[in-house]
Amino acid sequence: MIRFSSRYMIAALLLCGSVHFAQAQKVMEEYEVFPTRLETDIPYRIPAIATASNGDLIAVADYRYCRMDIGFAGTGDGRIDLRASISKDNGQTWEAPFTIVKGKGRGFDVFHTGFGDPCVVADRNSSRVFLLSCAGNVSFPGGTREKHQGIAIMHSEDNGKTWSEPKDIAEDVYAMFDKCSRGPVRAMFIGSGKIHQSRYTKTGKYYRLYCSNLVTDVNGARLNYVLYSDDFGDTWKVLGDKEDVPIINGDEPKVEELPDGRIIISSRCGGGRLFNIFDFENKEQATGKWGKQAFSG
């Protein structure tokens, strides 16, 4: 069962820099945003959260008809929907969950089988919200360059109330790694629940977005890169030199912007976490280099 308790909700919002401590103190009671009360209920999994420019909180989660991760349903249907709930009072109460996109299950085109593991970010200066998720019916471990998970993107123009149809950008992202020494990559898991909007860098209409990915290279090694977008998620580029891998042997990475504008990536590993920091030579052109990978233990 997934519960958003007051302390977890507060922690998530403070990490987003969206709620002052005095406001957070007012959230005293636990509220079950995505209820899964019985074993027979369709389970919710993998929640993500963002704060819209109007102050609304937008929570998104998998609604797993197949009860499994993407690609692990075996001979089952494989259907996973994405659902959202909105709070207009800083998390004290939430609207009933509604469907952003329905998975169609096995038997349709592979991309629309299911959508899961979302990450979401809201533009600070407009009513636009961007969502990215895995898609399809191929597991991450089972991915190949020719047959892999999709990467679905969706936009909302009204602070998360309604959403565009999903678009698959997987080929554009995979192709960026085809000609590097570790490519072509065999599989990719993008976002890991976190997209960050820069507080400082704006080269066009929007402040820059950053997210991280987990890939298996041509030899099966697990690598983490950071991607960035200057058009609010429509297109993405690799931060830094693709030959200069920021994290090796990490899993489920997250990316954040330091107070001085540098970019830090943090990735889970056995016994702790791996870290690296990107120093910019030119922030607008996104040029610079990664430091040396460090272990928290």
What positions do the PLM features span?
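Bacterial Sec-dependent N-terminal signal peptides
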Residues: 1-26
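Asp-box/BNR beta-propeller blade signature and adjacent active/binding-site loops
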Residues: 25-297
